């Protein structure tokens, strides 16, 4: 029987919920220039920042288990928020293995190498080629090329997805140069195809995009380009097509054939799943596959359970996460987001667990079907807000988690005017969430998972489409039934925190114990005001 807490005492009437509102990509930067957040009309957030306890916390680098100065991202951010601790991320885990020359010791990689050598087949290395560090890292590709050379694999083809989203929009030439230089040093490898990530890394069930990438990789009759990779990219720039949207191009006769090996070196699952499903699942039916090569497929990480692939770095199990604590105390929780961020408030927030927890209700709001979100900067925020208000006012949920995708998804387009509109849309929605939470005497905690929209141009004056390393805001609006402050004291939020401190803060508001595994600490400090000298007590 789960332990009950004082939080359940409200079951006799309506529960006063704690509402965690995550503003995806809403970072903090003091400068106003090229800052879509500061330049937007945000009366609600401005008023809340002035009137309620607030602070800035770190959401990048070592504070979320990434290398120093590595920008945060949605997967890492939601995982850290949900876990209440800093977790070594896959980027670091894989990089450490490559740096210490331990790829040779991984059994499934050795098995693949032996099979390819015995059958004289080709190894295809497929993935995003940049140093963005969000979905992949070019150092991992270089490490795999060195591993292939050491193992004696002679035929190696690289299928490069160009970035321009987690990196500057026109930066792919520098990464292709690194790859080509690696080929020359090692004496193996060829650049077989190029494809913008827009086509190969969709996560919104735009299967017509994935189909184009699939055809590029599998069709033996796909036309070969007569131009070099550099010429193709330069011509694309001249036509105002940046790296993210580069049309699929085949450079050499190498394509996926029966018996070949494939290593997909993206480590983040959400934008790798759809393509790998189309390549590996016999029952796949989202589009007609004329060619279905039988391959030996390896992925660096687990993209989804039960895929017919071998995984190099299986997930490390996590327990005592925020969602689990809520569930184990017999309380109900509600998670909602639109399509683009739905996995983040569910799968990632729960530490990589697909299935809902006992008492966890999930609600998906479809994202608009547009080519890029600058065409619809409001996205589905209004529908999302309405569904969340209904959950808040139902009076049955103790914890509600909502993600607003607009600052991040529109920020990624690099279009300042559209991003300002996205920010203003979210600001209005926060006002509605605040009203509903207030009706229920609940508590609202507003934060973000990483920065983005606060920087719209880079130092070179080009659009900045990537995330940032800037801190993110936290605002706590106490409800009457969830007050920590009271007679003779008030609260403030301490400085020096990170995303790992959000879960402990929420547990304190919910009057639930913090598990030992949660090494984060509550951001709440109580200021005793009933004496001449204020006494600050940190809640840990």
From Swiss-Prot:
Record-listed substrate binding positions: 135, 165-166, 197, 203, 268-271, 341
Where does this protein act, in terms of pathway?
Carbohydrate degradation; glycolysis; pyruvate from D-glyceraldehyde 3-phosphate: step 3/5
Q: One Pfam family of this protein, by short name? A: Metalloenzyme
Co-factor binding details: Binds 2 manganese ions per subunit.
GO biological process annotations for this chain's record?
A: glucose catabolic process; glycolytic process
Q: Which reaction does it catalyse?
A: (2R)-2-phosphoglycerate = (2R)-3-phosphoglycerate
GO terms (molecular function) for this protein are:
manganese ion binding; phosphoglycerate mutase activity
Please tell me where Mn(2+) 1 binds in this chain: 408, 412, 467
Give cofactor(s), names only: Mn(2+)
State the superkingdom: Bacteria
* Catalytic site: 74 (phosphoserine intermediate)
- Name the enzyme group at the top EC level: isomerase
What keyword terms does UniProt attach to this protein? Glycolysis, Isomerase, Manganese, Metal-binding
Can you tell me which residues bind Mn(2+) 2? 24, 74, 449-450
Q: What is its EC number?
A: 5.4.2.12
Q: GO cellular component annotations, sorted alphabetically?
A: cytosol
Tell me how this protein assembles: Monomer.
Instruction: Note the NCBIfam families from the entry.
Output: pgm_bpd_ind
The family classification in the record reads: Belongs to the BPG-independent phosphoglycerate mutase family.
What job does this protein perform? Catalyzes the interconversion of 2-phosphoglycerate and 3-phosphoglycerate.
Q: What is this protein's record name? A: 2,3-bisphosphoglycerate-independent phosphoglycerate mutase
Q: Please name the source species.
A: Prochlorococcus marinus (strain SARG / CCMP1375 / SS120)
Q: Which gene encodes it?
A: gpmI
């Amino acid at each position: 029987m789960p332990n009950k807490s004082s939080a359940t005492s409200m079951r006799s009437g309506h529960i006063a919920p704690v509402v965690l509102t995550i503003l995806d990509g809403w970072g903090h930067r003091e400068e106003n220039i090229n800052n879509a957040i500061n330049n937007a009309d945000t009366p609600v957030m401005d008023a809340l920042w002035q009137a309620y306890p607030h602070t800035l916390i770190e959401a990048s680098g070592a504070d979320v288990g990434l290398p120093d100065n590595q920008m945060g991202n949605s997967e890492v951010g939601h995982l850290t928020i949900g876990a209440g601790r800093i977790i070594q991320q896959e980027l670091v885990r894989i990089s450490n293995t490559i740096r210490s020359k331990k790829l040779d010791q991984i059994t499934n990689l050795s098995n693949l190498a032996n099979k390819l050598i015995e059958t004289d087949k080709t190894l295809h290395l497929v993935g995003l080629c940049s140093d963005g560090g969000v979905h992949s890292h070019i150092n991992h590709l270089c490490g795999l090329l060195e591993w292939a050379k050491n193992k004696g694999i002679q035929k190696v083809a690289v299928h490069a997805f160009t970035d321009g989203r987690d990196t500057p929009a026109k930066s792919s030439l520098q990464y292709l140069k690194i790859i080509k230089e690696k080929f020359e040093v090692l004496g193996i490898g060829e650049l077989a195809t190029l494809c913008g990530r827009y086509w190969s890394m969709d996560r919104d069930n735009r299967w017509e995009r994935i189909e184009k990438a699939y055809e590029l990789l599998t069709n033996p009759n796909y036309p070969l380009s007569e131009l070099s990779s550099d010429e193709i990219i330069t011509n694309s720039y001249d036509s105002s097509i940046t790296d993210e949207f580069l049309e699929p191009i085949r450079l050499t006769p190498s394509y996926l054939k029966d018996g070949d090996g494939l290593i997909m070196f993206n480590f983040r699952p959400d934008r790798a799943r759809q393509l790998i499903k189309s390549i590996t699942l016999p029952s796949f039916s989202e589009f007609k596959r004329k060619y279905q090569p039988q391959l030996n497929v390896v992925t660096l990480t687990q993209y989804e359970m039960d895929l017919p692939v071998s995984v190099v770095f299986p997930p490390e199990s996590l327990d005592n996460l925020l969602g689990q604590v809520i569930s184990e105390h017999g309380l109900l929780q509600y998670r909602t987001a639109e399509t683009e961020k739905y996995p983040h408030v569910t799968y990632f927030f729960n530490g990589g667990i697909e299935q809902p927890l006992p008492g966890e209700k999930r609600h998906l709001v479809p994202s608009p079907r547009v080519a890029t979100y600058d065409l619809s900067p409001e996205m589905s925020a209004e529908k999302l807000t309405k569904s969340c208000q209904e959950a808040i006012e139902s009076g049955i949920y103790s914890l509600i988690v909502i993600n607003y995708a607009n600052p991040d998804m529109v920020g990624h387009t690099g279009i300042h005017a559209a991003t300002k509109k996205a920010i203003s849309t979210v600001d209005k929605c926060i006002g509605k969430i605040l009203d509903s939470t207030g009706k229920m005497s609940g508590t609202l905690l507003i934060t973000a998972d990483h920065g983005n929209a606060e920087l719209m141009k880079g130092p070179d004056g080009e659009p900045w489409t990537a995330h940032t390393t800037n801190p993110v805001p936290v605002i706590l609006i106490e409800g009457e039934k969830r007050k920590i402050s009271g007679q003779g004291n008030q609260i403030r939020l301490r400085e020096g925190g990170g995303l790992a401190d959000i879960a402990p803060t929420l547990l304190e508001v919910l009057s639930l114990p913090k598990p030992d595994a949660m090494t984060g600490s509550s951001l709440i400090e109580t200021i005793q005001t009933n004496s001449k000298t204020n006494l600050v007590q940190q809640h840990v």
